[in-house]
C-alpha cells in the first residue's frame, strides 16, 4: 500500500545502511538521555533501581502506544540500565514453539528478551511463554505420536519486554502476566524540539531554536518522524542554503515535502477530505472509508487515525467517523448545518 511510502509514516522503513547507522547514533542509550514520557520514565527509574537493589531480574514489561514513540529504544535503555544483554525478535518471526525455545534457552541470568509486535504471536508460541514468564520454566515436547513426552527445562530469570501498537489485541492471559504496563503518549512540541536539537547535535548539524520548534510542530508528536524529517530538511539546507536549519529553511523544506502546518501529508488530507466531501462530514463506517481512500482498514485504525483523533480532527463514534469543526477550519470549508 502507498502508506509505506509516506515520509511521515511512523513505522520503521527499509532504509540505507548509512541512515540506519544515523538512526542508531541518534537513539538515547540511558534513561537520563531519554526525553519526554515523564510519568513512564519516572516509574521505570524506580522499578529498575528496586530490581538492582534486590539483585533480581526486572519484572516483565509491556510497552504500548502508537508507532514511532520509542518502544524499541526504551527496551534497549532498560537493558543498558540493568547492565544486561538484549535479544530482539518480533511476533510474526516466531512461527513455531521451537523458535521461541531457541531464544529462551540462550538467555543469561537477567537478560532482556524483546518481542516487537507481540500481539501477532501465534497461540502455539504464546502457550510456551506462560510458564516461561511465570515460573522460568520451558515445557517442550520430545518425539512424536505415542512416544511423545513432555520435559521441563529450567530457565534463568529474565525480563520479557513486549511492544505493541494494539494492546487490546493481546489475549487476557498474556496481558495479565506483564507486571509493568507502560503506555507511551504522543510527544508535545517542547519535548519533540529537544529531541530534534539533540539529534542535530549528534549529526553536527547547525539548527536554531525556532527551526527545531518548526520541525517538532510538524512531526505528529512522533520522534521517529521528527528524526526522519530532520534528515530530509538537512539535505534541503545543505543544497539550497548555507547548511543551517532556521525556521524559514524548515518551513520551505517541509512545504516542498508537502507536509502542512499540522504535520499532515497527502494521506491525512485525503482521509479528512473523504469524510467531509464524500460522506458529508460523517458518520462513515471504517470499511466504507477504507474503500473510499484505497487504504487498508488496519492502516487507518492503527496509523492514520490515532493522531487525527488526538488532535481533535476526527471523532470516533458508534455510528462511524465524523469530521470535527477543526477539520473543516483546517481546509477553510464552511461546515454545513445538520
Curated annotation (Swiss-Prot):
Annotated positions binding ATP: 27, 68, 71-73, 134-136, 177, 187, 224
InterPro entries: AAA+_ATPase, AAA_lid_4, DNA_helicase_Holl-junc_RuvB, P-loop_NTPase, RuvB-like_N, RuvB_C, WH-like_DNA-bd_sf, WH_DNA-bd_sf
GO molecular function: ATP binding; ATP hydrolysis activity; four-way junction DNA binding; four-way junction helicase activity
Region feature Head domain (RuvB-H), mapped onto this chain: 261-338
Protein residues bound to DNA: 297, 316, 321
Its job: The RuvA-RuvB-RuvC complex processes Holliday junction (HJ) DNA during genetic recombination and DNA repair, while the RuvA-RuvB complex plays an important role in the rescue of blocked DNA replication forks via replication fork reversal (RFR). RuvA specifically binds to HJ cruciform DNA, conferring on it an open structure. The RuvB hexamer acts as an ATP-dependent pump, pulling dsDNA into and through the RuvAB complex. RuvB forms 2 homohexamers on either side of HJ DNA bound by 1 or 2 RuvA tetramers; 4 subunits per hexamer contact DNA at a time.
Oligomeric and partner information: Homohexamer. Forms an RuvA(8)-RuvB(12)-Holliday junction (HJ) complex. HJ DNA is sandwiched between 2 RuvA tetramers; dsDNA enters through RuvA and exits via RuvB. An RuvB hexamer assembles on each DNA strand where it exits the tetramer. Each RuvB hexamer is contacted by two RuvA subunits (via domain III) on 2 adjacent RuvB subunits; this complex drives branch migration. In the full resolvosome a probable DNA-RuvA(4)-RuvB(12)-RuvC(2) complex forms which resolves the HJ.
Name of the protein this chain belongs to: Holliday junction branch migration complex subunit RuvB
Organism listed in the record: Shewanella woodyi (strain ATCC 51908 / MS32)
